[in-house]
């Protein structure tokens, strides 16, 4: 009987470690919402960026016409001058994901300098996950953000991406509408089942 109880405790520890790992995952932000990464978005990318709060492990999803545009991660100076000659990172597949792997500022411009000069550029400030909650910021009375939680508790639940330019969905897998507990609810159910199996 002691061996079974030790195994159950070990299994519970492994599950809790797995739950802790999933909580560290971030959100997927659709850059530009329904418009995607375009030269003349319906909402300025600067405004879009300021309405959101980005944290380490979040992902930016750039959707654009493959072969007609691209996304370049650049320095702040290159961002300010729309200089496309020395990018830090170049994305060109038309459906690009960029992981925000550390806190600080990131700068993105179109691979077409003329598009950048028209406003197709994005600056993102990434906050540390340790000291800040993960919720959208609103600087103006705009429509409620449409988003979904990946696995950490945070902003209120939403629905699938719509016309709102503040759309966020889980990074992996198809979008589904979570309950008010987000994805922590299933983790709690597993934990309760595991604890009850000990008795």
UniProtKB/Swiss-Prot annotation:
Coiled coil: none annotated. Confined to flowers. One of its GO terms (cellular component) is side of membrane. Residues 1-23 form the signal peptide. PROSITE patterns: PHYTOCYANIN (PS51485). May act as a carbohydrate transporter. This is Early nodulin-like protein 3. It comes from Arabidopsis thaliana.
């Amino acid at each position: 009987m002691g061996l079974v109880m030790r195994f159950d405790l070990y299994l519970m520890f492994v599950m809790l470690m797995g739950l802790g790992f999933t909580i560290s995952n971030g959100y997927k932000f659709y850059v530009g919402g329904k418009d995607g990464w375009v030269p003349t978005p319906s909402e300025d990318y600067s405004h879009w960026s300021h309405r959101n709060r980005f944290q380490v492990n979040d992902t930016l999803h750039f959707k654009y016409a493959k072969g007609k545009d691209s996304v370049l991660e650049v320095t702040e100076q290159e961002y300010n001058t729309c200089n496309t000659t020395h990018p830090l990172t170049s994305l060109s597949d038309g459906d690009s994901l960029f992981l925000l792997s550390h806190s600080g500022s990131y700068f993105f411009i179109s691979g077409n300098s003329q598009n950048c000069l028209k406003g197709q550029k994005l600056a993102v400030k990434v906050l540390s996950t340790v000291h800040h909650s993960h919720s959208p910021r609103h600087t103006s009375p705009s429509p409620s953000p449409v988003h979904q939680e990946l696995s950490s508790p945070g902003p209120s639940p939403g629905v699938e991406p719509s016309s709102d330019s503040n759309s966020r969905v889980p990074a992996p897998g198809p979008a589904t509408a979570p309950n008010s507990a987000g994805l922590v609810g299933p983790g709690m159910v597993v934990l309760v089942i595991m604890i009850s199996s000990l008795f």
